[in-house]
């Protein structure tokens, strides 16, 4: 068996340690691999903090959260946040435009609309609304589902927390239970709608669940720009809302080597972010997502963009292309 200190070290380093300790001396050969790894981690931590400092609330627009913050009642904010996260795919400005259109069709605000909602009445109000794959019919079904939930449980937070287990590492299991519960509420209607399941992905299916994790970020985190509506879920349990754009950036700065954007990648990246902030690992998400939303980290490398980017000291692309 290997000594615990030798695990995951290159053979040359492990052999050097064995030879030194076997010669009857307490002197240890310096582990350059560990030193290098610590140096990289230090650079990345500095880069992430610089990135967070570069983007404050003034960089929020265009973002679906802008629309949510237009409501003042926490009950409206919770429902608006849920719908806004579900439809947070595609062009950011179009998302914001379509969300404002959607909420303008909800008399009395999102909470009042949903709690009074029935499939037929909801469908009438929402006729003609569409966002890419989804139409007003999908919103009507989801409103009916939420109506069942809110009448019985009072809030989405209470339903979500039923699946939260003591000692959980993250929200994964609770999110699975939450999605399963919602899918069951209007099962027949859900199964009839071709793209409805796209609105409610689950970690159990391997999905990264970017939009649901985004919803959780908004309602759980108490720091700007998020809402902090929920008080029974710890920010330390949140998982990074991972899409292809954020995943690409995470690869470039060494947070993952995985190729598939799925739940495993989201958990891995979150775990590494915990090294820099165990209590609030996804506080970096807002700033990371600005790079994609605002076009500050395009697919095509641009020396002017790269040299100004706070992440360049940790970016593999920046180093490999000799831009440093």
Identify what each model region corresponds to:
Residues 2, 14-17, 27-324:
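HhH-family (HhH-GPD) DNA N-glycosylase catalytic core used in base-excision repair
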Residues 11:
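Arg/Lys-rich RNA-binding interfaces used to dock onto structured RNA substrates
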Residues 22-24:
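Residue-identity detector for glycine
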């Amino acid at each position: 068996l290997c000594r615990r200190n030798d695990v995951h070290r290159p053979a040359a380093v492990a052999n050097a340690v064995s030879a030194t300790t076997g010669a009857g001396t307490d002197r240890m050969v310096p582990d350059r691999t560990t030193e290098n790894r610590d140096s990289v981690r230090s650079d990345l931590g500095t880069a992430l903090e610089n990135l967070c400092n570069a983007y404050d609330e003034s960089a929020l627009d265009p973002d679906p959260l802008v629309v949510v913050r237009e409501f003042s009642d926490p009950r409206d904010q919770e429902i608006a946040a849920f719908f806004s996260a579900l439809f947070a795919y595609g062009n950011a400005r179009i998302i914001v435009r379509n969300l404002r259109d959607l909420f303008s069709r909800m008399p009395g605000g999102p909470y009042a609309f949903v709690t009074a909602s029935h499939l037929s009445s909801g469908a009438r109000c929402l006729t003609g609304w569409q966002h890419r794959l989804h139409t007003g019919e999908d919103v009507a079904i989801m409103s009916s589902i939420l109506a069942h939930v809110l009448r019985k449980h009072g809030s989405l937070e209470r339903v979500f927390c039923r699946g939260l287990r003591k000692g959980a590492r993250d929200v994964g299991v609770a999110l699975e239970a939450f999605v399963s519960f919602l899918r069951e509420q209007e099962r027949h209607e859900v199964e009839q709608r071709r793209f409805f399941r796209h609105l409610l992905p689950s970690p159990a299916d391997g999905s990264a669940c970017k939009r649901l994790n985004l919803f959780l970020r908004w309602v759980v985190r108490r720091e700007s720009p998020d809402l902090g509506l929920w008080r029974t879920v710890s920010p330390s349990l949140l998982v990074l809302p991972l899409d292809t754009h954020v995943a690409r950036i995470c690869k470039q700065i060494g947070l993952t080597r995985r190729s598939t954007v799925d739940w495993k990648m989201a958990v891995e990246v979150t775990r590494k972010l915990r090294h820099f902030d165990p209590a609030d690992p996804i506080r970096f998400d807002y700033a990371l997502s600005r790079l994609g939303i605002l076009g500050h980290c395009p697919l095509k490398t641009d020396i002017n963009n790269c040299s100004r980017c706070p992440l360049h000291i940790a970016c593999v692309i920046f180093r490999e292309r000799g831009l440093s």
